[in-house]
């Protein structure tokens, strides 16, 4: 296997090619990419946790340092001004020397406002990409060249196609997340609270709450019916019934995003439903291939949901086809089958059909689907089906002609378990699909 340094070298070659193309298309000389700045809480002197500009960390694995700048023109070696103040109040990261620094010119920037004296005098034809437009104006960058939509659309579109370096980083992120999931399951089995399970997860992955790529969803019992539950109860429930964990990790700026659901007991209706959702998720992944729209896989899983609702007698006296046609599967799986994954958890350009940013919206029947692209090699996506028992979504079905098909007694019995979600991260290849999550033996 090639070293990370060799993979990174080729990664930079790819980014340089994309940069040359986008600069030529939009008649720019270079791109100035800003890592970002710290922003203080309103009426306070404490900053919010720093989150780096994803377009910056696409080039360099510098994720925790604000006030850095990267100048790229697609021809010359990328130049990084690395913020290196004299500061005895805060930790100061040293000038980096790592596997990637041979491919980038690294220069110390001692003052946050010192970049102006470092840049070329003629800046009218430089594009700025970053979160602080007023900083770009202070640097005399033309307003029309600040986060230009066409440039960002182009860069976002090609971010869907991961380089070998990016795939290597994502596989490392998987390893960290899998370790966390194993530790969290053990904590659940030992009767810990959501708060303490989360601590076990963070310890196993080596993350802080501010370092994980998204807020961990640690949901016991009926909390699993809240799709993005992030409360973290300090008190363990008197009865453990179910545990849904949606939690990831980050490596060199690249995310993992995994979900598992466990039943406290191994032989009840809920446990059997968990097993069946898991089996159907794996069966769907086995069918995935390049050249097929992601939307098709979402629709196919609604057909699989219908099969499970019928098998478990949650919906009765109705064909699977009629369930899908009349959207009786909708309240049980109200979200999409997944989303693109990469530098961001919900990675960009899921709706883009070309590098000009042509948008194809999700089908009106499934408005929360986050991707409508045709799958191609090097794309990385999540596959995360679920079945939930959500009061607000089921209540409208209590009346009307379809109510008689719902087994309300069974549904009431399952509500205390909340729901089920199983999520793997997959890579599309020329001749198949790689399941990064299952390759690490996470059941």
Swiss-Prot record:
NCBIfam families xref list: PRK13607.1
Alphabetical GO CC annotations of the entry are: cytosol
Q: Which reaction does it catalyse?
A: Xaa-L-Pro dipeptide + H2O = an L-alpha-amino acid + L-proline
Q: Which UniProt keywords apply?
A: Dipeptidase, Hydrolase, Manganese, Metal-binding, Metalloprotease, Protease
What protein name is recorded for this chain?
Answer: Xaa-Pro dipeptidase
Which family is this protein grouped under?
A: Belongs to the peptidase M24B family. Bacterial-type prolidase subfamily.
Query: Record's SUPFAM superfamilies?
Result: Creatinase/aminopeptidase
Explain how, and how many, cofactor molecules are bound: Binds 2 manganese ions per subunit.
Q: What is the lineage of its organism?
A: Bacteria, Pseudomonadati, Pseudomonadota, Gammaproteobacteria, Enterobacterales
Identify the PROSITE patterns for this entry.
Answer: PROLINE_PEPTIDASE (PS00491)
Give GO terms for biological process.
Answer: proteolysis
Known function: Splits dipeptides with a prolyl residue in the C-terminal position.
GO MF terms held by the record: aminopeptidase activity; metal ion binding; metalloexopeptidase activity; phosphoric triester hydrolase activity; proline dipeptidase activity
Q: Which domain of life is it from?
A: Bacteria
UniProt source species: Salmonella paratyphi B (strain ATCC BAA-1250 / SPB7)
EC number(s) per UniProt? 3.4.13.9
Give the InterPro entries listed for this entry: Creatin/AminoP/Spt16_N, Creatinase/aminopeptidase-like, PepQ_N, Pept_M24, Peptidase_M24B_aminopep-P_CS, X-Pro_dipept-like, X_Pro_dipept
- Amino acids binding Mn(2+) 2: 246, 257, 423
């Amino acid at each position: 296997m090639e070293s990370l340094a060799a993979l990174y070298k080729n990664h930079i070659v790819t980014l340089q090619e994309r940069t040359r193309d986008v600069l030529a298309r939009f008649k720019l000389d270079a791109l100035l990419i800003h890592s970002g700045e710290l922003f203080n809480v309103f009426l306070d002197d404490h900053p919010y946790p720093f989150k780096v500009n994803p377009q910056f960390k696409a080039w360099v694995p510098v994720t925790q340092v604000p006030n850095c700048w990267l100048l790229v023109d697609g021809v010359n070696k990328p130049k990084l001004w690395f913020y290196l103040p004299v500061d005895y109040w805060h930790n100061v990261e040293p000038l980096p020397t790592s596997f990637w620094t041979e491919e980038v010119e690294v220069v110390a920037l001692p003052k946050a406002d010192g970049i102006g004296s470092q840049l070329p005098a003629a800046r009218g034809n430089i594009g700025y990409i970053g979160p602080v437009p007023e900083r770009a104006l202070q640097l005399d960058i033309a307003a029309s060249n600040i986060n230009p939509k066409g440039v960002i659309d182009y860069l976002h579109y090609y971010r869907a196609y991961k380089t070998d370096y990016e795939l290597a980083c994502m596989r490392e992120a998987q390893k960290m997340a899998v370790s966390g999931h194993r530790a969290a399951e053990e904590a659940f089995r030992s009767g810990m609270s959501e708060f303490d399970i989360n601590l076990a997860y963070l310890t196993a992955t080596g993350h802080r709450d501010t370092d994980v790529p998204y807020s961990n969803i640690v949901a016991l019992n009926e909390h699993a019916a809240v799709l993005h539950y992030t409360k973290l109860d300090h008190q363990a429930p008197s009865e453990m019934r179910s545990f849904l964990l949606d939690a990831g990790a980050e490596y060199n700026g690249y995310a993992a995003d995994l979900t598992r659901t466990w039943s406290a007991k191994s032989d009840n209706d809920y446990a059997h439903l968990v097993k069946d959702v898991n089996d159907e998720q794996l069966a769907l992944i086995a069918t995935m291939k390049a050249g097929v729209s992601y939307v098709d896989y979402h629709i196919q899983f609604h057909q699989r949901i219908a099969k499970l609702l019928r098998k478990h007698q949650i919906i009765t006296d109705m064909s699977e086809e009629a369930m899908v046609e009349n959207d009786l599967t909708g309240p049980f799986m109200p979200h999409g089958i997944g989303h693109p994954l990469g530098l961001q958890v919900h990675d960009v350009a899921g709706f883009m059909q070309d590098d000009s940013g042509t948008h194809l919206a999700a089908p009106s029947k499934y408005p929360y689907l986050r991707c409508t692209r045709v799958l191609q090699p090097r794309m990385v996506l999540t596959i995360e089906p679920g079945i939930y028992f959500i009061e607000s979504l089921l209540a409208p079905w209590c009346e009307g002609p379809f109510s008689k098909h719902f087994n309300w007694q069974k549904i009431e019995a399952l509500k205390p378990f909340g729901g089920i979600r199983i999520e793997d991260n997959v890579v599309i290849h020329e001749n198949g699909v790689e399941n990064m999550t299952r390759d690490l033996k996470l059941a």
